[in-house]
UniProtKB/Swiss-Prot annotation:
Gene that encodes the chain: Spata2
Biological process annotations from GO: necroptotic process; protein K63-linked deubiquitination; protein linear deubiquitination; regulation of inflammatory response; regulation of necroptotic process; regulation of tumor necrosis factor-mediated signaling pathway; seminiferous tubule development; spermatogenesis
UniProt cross-references to PANTHER family, sorted A to Z: SPERMATOGENESIS-ASSOCIATED PROTEIN 2 (PTHR15326:SF8), SPERMATOGENESIS-ASSOCIATED PROTEIN 2/TAMOZHENNIC (PTHR15326)
GO molecular function term, any single one: signaling receptor complex adaptor activity
Subunit structure: Interacts (via the PIM motif) with RNF31/HOIP (via the PUB domain); the interaction is direct. Interacts (via the PUB domain) with CYLD; the interaction is direct.
Keywords: Cytoplasm, Necrosis, Nucleus
Tissue and organ expression note: Widely expressed, with highest expression in testis, lung and intestine, and lower expression in brain, heart and spleen. Present at high level in Sertoli cells: expressed from stage I to stage XII of the testis seminiferous epithelium (at protein level).
Protein name, as recorded: Spermatogenesis-associated protein 2
Family per similarity comment: Belongs to the SPATA2 family.
Sequence motif PIM motif, location on chain: 321-338
Coiled coil spans: none
Pfam families named in the record: SPATA2_PUB-like
UniProt-listed Gene3D superfamilies: 1.20.58.2190
Subcellular location: Cytoplasm; Nucleus
């Protein structure tokens, strides 16, 4: 700060107030100190001047900051009034030092309490009054010392005048930037650390506010773009499965949890029921039960037979549609799906039947009647009308009429083949009782059909060999052709044995056949 300019302003300030006291007619002084205020504002706004040199005796910015932080009633306008009142005390002291009323200051009076004590801290008030020569006495009164330094009192009064003008400038800056969210304390901090004038401080605060708003807007835009991209990514990777897919293994539990249809509801159907449970498993087929084999041996199986098979199956699920046993289809070469099979083909009056699988000899016969239907022995292949084979005395397996439960036919077949003759007779007795029990329900007697197995390679009837590892069945013709086909269960070759040499001590779920 220019010292010469400040000293010149100090002399004009002292002359202005001393001229008020001089009542001589030739000494005329202006009645307003407006020119002093303008000169003081220019002094405080000099460019590139350190803020520490604006005030010499009073630490103005520290006093204002502590008051604004500590006292809720303090503000820049209140500080302006407080500095103006202290300036008046200093002016009266250096103009009228002999008057007794100015030799003491009572701090409990109304103006002092309202304008000074409610705005400035007690320590700052004590420091300013000590610069003027007052010392505290009895806690509520300040007494003037015997010796009063008139020059120091004038300098303190001039500092208080500059403090009053600086408060006016900071109020002007705050009025320009308060719409940007700045407080009076922010203005004081900016003015304390800036070497610019009042206009430069207000422009700096505005630029800082605009940059902060721009940064906030940019951050909000980035956050919105990020949230939008996250939502788009979630929508892109969101699984769009509205219902369980029938071709995915993960939803097998969905189909297993469904309740099997009751036997009564299936018996009311007039057409053969074919329930599609999804795509067939690639390397697994279900070994048909004896009752299903008995039904499939006749091309004219009734819907009642199919309903009884569905009830025996337990789950009520069939793997394919119903077709005749004489429909020789190779599972490895046939390109036409089995679903295209028409039931009208099976209901034709003239049906060509195969008599021998090894050397095919076809003969034409009329549809069999219920009286002429015979059962074929699984061991020797002889057709018999009774429940016992006339050649090898083996029990002929008939469809079971028991209740629908999970895999009931498996236990009955294995029990009848694993135990001796007493168990076989007992099994036949139970089957007879079951058929007698079903007689009132179905008015028509059921035909006795042959129970033969289909080959797991060519799907032809007459499978007489079974693999001891994976339970896959094969006919004599495919046994030589596919003997070296690897067994998928243990990655070894198949070990086929004739059915007559099997002891039927199989593991659970022996109806599963793996290809």
């Amino acid at each position: 700060m220019d010292t010469k300019y400040k000293d010149d302003l100090f002399r004009k300030y002292v002359q202005f107030h001393e001229g008020k006291v001089d009542t001589t007619p030739g000494n005329q002084q202006p009645g307003s100190d407006e020119y002093l205020r303008v000169a003081a504002a220019t002094l405080l706004s000099l460019h590139k001047v350190d803020p520490l040199y604006r005030f010499r005796l009073i630490q103005f910015y520290e006093v204002v900051e502590s008051s604004l932080r500590s006292l809720s009633s303090s503000s820049l306008s209140a500080l302006h009034c407080a500095f103006s009142m202290l300036e008046t005390m200093a002016i009266n002291l250096f103009l009228f030092p002999w008057k007794k009323e100015f030799r003491s200051i009572k701090t409990y009076t109304g103006p002092f309490v309202y304008y000074v004590k409610s705005t400035l801290l007690e320590k700052d008030i004590r420091a300013i009054l000590r610069f003027m020569g007052y010392e505290p006495e009895l806690g509520t009164v300040y007494k003037l010392k015997e010796l009063v330094e008139s020059l120091q009192v004038k300098m303190v009064s001039f500092e208080l005048f500059l403090a009053k003008v600086e408060c006016e400038q900071m109020l002007g800056i705050h009025s320009q930037v308060k719409d940007k969210g700045y407080s009076e304390l922010d203005v004081v901090a900016e003015r304390k650390g800036s070497t610019e004038d009042a206009r430069g401080c207000s422009d700096a605060l505005r630029r800082r506010a605009e940059s902060r708003e721009h940064l906030t807007t940019s951050m909000a835009r980035v956050a919105l773009q990020k949230s939008a991209s996250e939502r788009a990514a979630k929508d892109y990777y969101k699984p769009r499965v509205t219902k369980p897919s029938r071709s995915v293994d993960a939803y097998d539990s969905y189909w297993e949890s469904r309740k099997p249809p009751s036997k009564a509801s299936l018996s009311l159907r007039k057409e053969p029921l074919a329930m599609d449970v999804g795509e067939d498993l690639k390397d697994e087929i279900i070994r048909p039960s004896p009752s299903l084999l008995a039904m499939s041996s006749s091309p004219h199986g009734s819907p009642d037979d199919l309903s009884s098979i569905s009830s025996i199956n337990g789950l009520g699920l069939l793997r394919s549609t119903y077709f005749s046993t004489q429909d020789d289809v190779d599972l490895y070469t046939d390109s036409e799906p089995r679903a295209t099979y028409r039931r009208q083909d099976a209901l034709r009056p003239d049906v060509w039947l195969v008599k021998n699988d090894t050397h095919p000899i076809y003969h034409k016969r009329s549809p069999p009647t219920k009286e002429s239907a015979l059962s074929k022995c699984q061991n020797c292949g002889l057709s018999c009308s009774s429940s016992l084979c006339q050649r090898c005395d083996s029990v002929l397996v008939c469809p079971s009429a028991s209740k629908p439960s999970a895999f009931p036919s498996k236990a009955s077949v294995h029990d009848s083949l694993a135990h001796g003759a007493p168990m076989r007779e007992k099994y036949v007795g139970h089957q007879t009782q079951g058929l007698d029990r079903l007689a009132p329900v179905h008015s028509k007697p059921k035909p006795s059909t042959t129970a033969t197995s289909r080959c797991g390679f060519c799907n032809r009837a007459g499978a007489t060999n079974t693999c001891t590892q994976c339970s896959k069945v094969s006919c004599d013709a495919c046994l030589g052709a596919y003997h070296y086909d690897p067994c998928c269960r243990k990655s070894e070759l198949h070990k086929f044995l004739p059915n007559s040499q099997l002891n039927y001590k199989s593991a659970p779920f022996s109806q599963l056949v793996y290809r």
